[in-house]
Amino acid sequence: VGADGTALQKPNSAQKEKMIVYKNSIQPSMVSETPAAYEGNLWKRLSQSKFRSSFTLKANDRHYVIEKGMDTVRSHATDFIRDRLAPAEPKNDGKQTPMRGHPVFIGQHATGTCCRSCLEKWHHIPKGRELTETEQKYVVDVIMEWIKRQMQTL
């Protein structure tokens, strides 16, 4: 029974797939949604952080994206996330993402996907376990959405 006295229904299998266990409770997972769906939530929260909103793509980063193309940058993001963020205990966690050198690194800091602590804080994906393929795709999608938005601004 819910707080309002109405009967609660158990989630169906599709709904269960959209949920993760988080700190001994079930929380809706954002991993199955598209980043654009969080216009009023994720992007707003990130924009309100002085640190996160300070990151922008510089001219050389923009040139790199134009030269390589979004598909190649997405491929790099996929590799970086798989190798540096997805393990349950990433090497040098909290320090594994450089502050410059690749548009994806800048995007990771801007979106709170740079380390497992930030991923937990900003995206409610718990640390201490390996990221699922769906979670990895979500992280890449968030970063690529940020890069796309940056490429549309001057």
Question: What role is predicted for each listed range?
Answer:
Residues 10, 16-18, 24:
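Polybasic, lysine-rich low-complexity intrinsically disordered segments
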Residues 138-154:
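Short Fe-S-cluster ligation motifs
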